Swiss-Prot record:
Recorded catalytic activity of this chain's protein: N-(5-phospho-beta-D-ribosyl)anthranilate = 1-(2-carboxyphenylamino)-1-deoxy-D-ribulose 5-phosphate
Record keyword Isomerase present: yes
EC top class, as a word: isomerase
Native source organism of the sequence: Sulfurihydrogenibium sp. (strain YO3AOP1)
Entry protein name: N-(5'-phosphoribosyl)anthranilate isomerase
Pathway assigned to this chain's UniProt record: Amino-acid biosynthesis; L-tryptophan biosynthesis; L-tryptophan from chorismate: step 3/5
Any one Pfam family match given in the protein's UniProt record, by short name: PRAI
Length: 203
């Protein structure tokens, strides 16, 4: 199971978290996010990674911005309102499409990307907020999603204290944690991060 730790802002923490065994390290390129990092900082973070892949999270980006980031990052995670036509401009094996889930009607959006074999990340919907809300998706809905598609990364309120119980109910392709493992936005509690990774990897 893939473990993604998102919202990293400090190169030193990126190195530590990579050594803990995180598969993916996520950086936020959305300027309105409290976890925003610029291109130069992203390059510094990339240099610190051991075996982890770097995921650049974008929100409603331009074509040019994505192409620039693909020269640095291993994956692009589209976390805004990007449609399938835009996402299909890029190699599907380097793309993750985040879908903010409120209720069962959102399953149709997931199917759209499933039909193209594009990895999907599901996050809890919160009006006007793109990720990092700390809110959870209903477990029954989460199970329907992961039963429907085998390339789903789950996120939203995941922590070292609840991940074991959640994974007793759902079997996703991957898990993504951010805000619940922080001291402050962009600064991780490394003890919590290590516990989270260990719990997932030692299942």
């Amino acid at each position: 199971m893939i473990v993604k730790i998102c919202g990293i802002t400090l190169p030193s923490q990126a190195r530590e978290i990579s050594e803990y065994g995180a598969d993916y390290i996520g950086v936020i390129t959305y300027p309105k996010s409290p976890r925003y990092v610029d291109v130069e900082r992203i390059k510094e973070i990339k240099e610190k990674l051991k075996n982890s892949k770097l995921v650049a999270v974008v929100v409603n980006p331009s074509l040019e911005q994505v192409l620039e980031l693909l020269n640095i990052a291993d994956f692009i995670q589209f976390h805004g309102d990007e449609g399938l036509d835009f996402v299909k401009n890029f190699p599907k094996d380097r793309v993750i499409k985040a879908i903010r889930v409120k209720n069962e009607s959102d399953l149709e959006k997931i199917k759209t990307f499933k039909n193209e074999d594009i990895t999907v990340l599901v996050d809890a919907f919160k009006e006007g907020v793109y990720g990092g809300t700390g809110e959870m998706i209903d477990l029954n809905l989460l199970k329907k999603i992961t039963d429907m598609y085998d390339k789903v990364i789950i996120s939203g309120g995941l922590s070292e204290s609840n991940i074991k119980e959640i994974l007793n109910h759902v079997k996703p392709y991957g898990v993504d944690a951010s805000s619940k493992l922080e001291v402050s936005p962009g600064v991780k509690d490394l003890d919590k991060v290590k516990k989270f990774i260990d719990i997932v990897k030692n299942r």
